[in-house]
Curated annotation (Swiss-Prot):
Cofactor notes: Binds 1 zinc ion per subunit.
Pro-peptide positions on chain: 20-244
Active site positions: 430
The protein's name: Extracellular metalloproteinase 2
Nuclease recorded as keyword: no
InterPro entries cross-referenced by the UniProt entry: FTP_domain, Fungal_virulence_M36, Peptidase_M36, Peptidase_M4/M1_CTD_sf
PANTHER family, per the entry: EXTRACELLULAR METALLOPROTEINASE MEP
Binding, Zn(2+): 429, 433
Length: 632
């Protein structure tokens, strides 16, 4: 999660680091760096499928072009006088849609928040696209000619001073890397990895600003700080990545210890599809007898430090991870059980998301991509009972090819203390931050949920997946669910309202976002809308009791899994830093691509109920629209 935490806690997390709450709870306080004053402004535009289909009739195609070439032609025709580069993370999703991402440049230097994403349909034509390209006046001179900007060491000092980062630059020295104007700093302390800097432009207030993008991983935050290239104590914007065998465990679908008892589960990867070809304890080269494999390395981390490889993990030569737990035990007494539970939950979610399309090419978290594309070497590092905090959790999501990092904390809200590793909804929420940060804007760009409304949707997606997965067979659309209630020991959970289709129980509509300035509150609104989407699709298609979906013509046959698939596919279509309206359109477009639009009216019924009706146009102020499309 961008922090599962309660409302004041979340804003402090880093780029990709996500944390939990929304309702205030005694004993909880903000941790880390508050990046809200430094968030990028929203600039993305999105052309949904219907508008794109009408527009591209005049677009020149060649049957000999591949999908990347077609996408490139669209960008060139849209902005013929601009320069850009193709990001090396294009792929074809499981729904047959090709995804290509471009980065705008000026004088060969990236404009870091200027992106163009093109989605190509099965017919080879442009399906949808979005962009945030800068259209203002370009710098007339190449800054690399005069080099009248500060060196990267000064930028590092500026970021540390302005943001009060716990990094000591001491005798920092900038060492050049292979990529132009990119440096790694030696001689620092306080960060979990060596800080980095890269010279980039950003667009802000209608102008381009040359900046040093300073990257610092300080645990609770993994930041990209855009420091002015001349006035190095001026930080323009900040992005945070931290947005965190036999097994005796709480089985998939049990959210927490109040819903059932631990049971024995044998070789669970046999029931979770093709996402783990090496099982959960191998990576194609090594076989492990601990809670480590191709997808996940789960261990304790009582010190809260950045070292993980040699930390304690349960070990069993027979792969029998069977440990005791009862509610009277303190967390350190059931450490083995907690690590095993975390390993089980994250691996199962990995495999489920794989079936929906979060594959190697899409930027998932795996050590060995088995020749299927993507960067690899980036399994998720999952720390149980992490000592760096309490009463929260977070997940850091750097770009594809770098490890995701989850940190699960104990909760001092009850006696004995409770362990977030045992509340599956918290774990799923956190891992979903990795999903959304890798899919939105492409796997090579983890900066695409950095604006306030987009970051709120990142929180909402986490709650949505956590809630969808915990549904029971006898639930109905009248069933309500809370978030974090067990771990926080808080009746009603950590969100302002429970998730409910009842407008009296949860009255949120899109207009409520207008007065919000914190991602968890915004996320609760988004997840509320998606909860209505979920139940509309379940009412249409039913709900399977199986862990993995059954696919018919590429689409899950039941409503719960169809909702999760469409939400995931929507992430791949929408532009970098989307708003609610663009996300709505992307989900509608995802259904068009997957089912030829069979669920359009069920989807729009949910969106319009909560204020995102068919005639809503995103403007300066958020005012509800409850209209339904004429063909519904």
């Amino acid at each position: 999660m961008h922090g599962l935490l309660l409302a004041g806690l979340a804003a402090a997390l880093p780029l990709g680091v996500a944390g939990l709450p929304a309702r205030q709870q005694s004993g909880l306080s903000p941790r880390g760096i508050d990046i809200n004053p430094y968030r990028f402004a929203s600039m993305a535009k999105y052309s949904e499928h219907k508008a794109t289909s009408q527009m591209v009739h005049s677009f020149s195609y060649s049957k000999d072009d591949d999908y990347v070439a077609t996408a490139t032609k669209l960008v060139k025709s849209t902005f013929p006088n601009m320069t850009f580069r193709t990001v090396k993370d294009h792929y074809i999703g499981t729904n047959g849609i090709g995804h290509v991402h471009f980065k705008q440049t000026a004088h060969g230097i990236d404009i870091d928040n200027a992106d163009f994403n093109v989605n190509i349909g099965r017919d080879g034509k442009v399906f949808t696209f979005g962009n945030s390209f800068y259209e203002g006046e370009m710098p007339k001179t190449n800054p690399l000619t005069k080099r009248d900007f500060a060196d990267p060491v000064k930028a590092l000092h500026g970021a540390i001073k302005t943001l009060k980062l716990p990094v000591k630059p001491q005798s920092a020295k900038a060492m050049p890397m292979k990529e132009a104007e990119t440096f790694m700093f030696e001689g620092t302390s306080g960060a979990l990895s060596e800080p980095m800097a890269k010279l980039v432009y950003i667009q802000k207030d209608g102008k381009l600003h040359l900046t040093w993008r300073v990257e610092t991983d300080v645990g609770d935050n993994w930041l990209l700080s855009y420091v002015d290239s001349k006035e190095t104590e001026t930080v323009h914007n900040v992005v945070d990545y931290v947005a965190s065998a036999d097994y005796k465990v709480f089985a998939w679908g049990l959210n927490d210890p109040t819903e059932g008892q631990p049971t024995m589960i044998k070789d669970p990867w046999n029931t979770t599809g093709s996402g783990s070809p090496f099982t959960w304890h191998g990576d194609g080269e090594m076989d492990y007898t601990v809670t480590r494999g191709n997808n996940i390395a789960a261990q304790d981390n009582p010190s809260g430090g950045g070292q993980w490889e040699n930390n304690y993990r349960p070990e069993s030569p027979e792969l029998s991870f069977v440990y005791e737990y009862n509610e009277q035990m303190e967390p350190e007494q059931f450490k083995d059980f907690a690590i095993t539970q975390l390993f089980y939950t994250t691996n199962t979610f990995h495999d489920l998301l794989y079936s929906f399309g979060f594959t190697e090419e899409a930027g998932n978290f795996q050590m060995n991509n088995n020749g299927k594309g993507g960067e690899g070497n980036d399994f998720a590092i999952c720390n149980a009972q992490d000592g760096s905090g309490t009463n929260n959790a977070n997940f850091a999501t750097p770009p594809d090819g770098q490890n995701g990092r989850m940190r699960m904390y104990t909760w001092t809200t009850a006696q004995p203390s409770r362990d977030g590793d045992l509340e599956a909804g918290i774990v799923i929420h956190e891992y979903a931050h990795g999903l959304s940060n890798r899919l939105c804007g492409g796997p090579a760009n983890s900066n695409c949920l950095s604006e306030l409304e987009a970051g709120g949707m990142g929180e909402g997606w986490g709650d949505f997946y956590a809630t969808a997965i915990r549904l029971k067979q006898d639930d109905t659309r009248e069933t309500d669910y809370t978030m974090g209630e067990w771990a926080a020991n808080m009746e009603g959970g950590i969100r302002e309202y429970p998730y409910s289709t009842n407008m009296q129980t949860n009255p949120y509509t899109y207009a409520d976002v207008e007065g919000m300035s914190e991602v968890h509150g915004i996320g609760t609104v988004w997840a509320t809308i998606l909860y209505d989407v979920l139940w509309n699709l379940i009412d249409e298609h039913g709900m399977s009791k199986n862990i993995m979906p059954k696919f018919v013509n590429g689409a899950p046959s039941d409503g719960r899994n169809l909702a999760m698939k469409l939400v995931l596919d929507g992430m791949t279509l929408m532009p970098c830093n989307p708003n609610f309206v663009q996300a709505r359109d992307a989900i509608i477009d995802a259904d068009q691509a997957l089912t030829n639009g069979q669920n359009k009216c069920a989807l729009m019924k949910a969106f319009s109920k909560r204020g995102l009706g068919s005639n809503y146009k995103h403007g300066k102020n958020r005012v509800n629209n409850f209209d339904m499309p004429a063909d519904c």
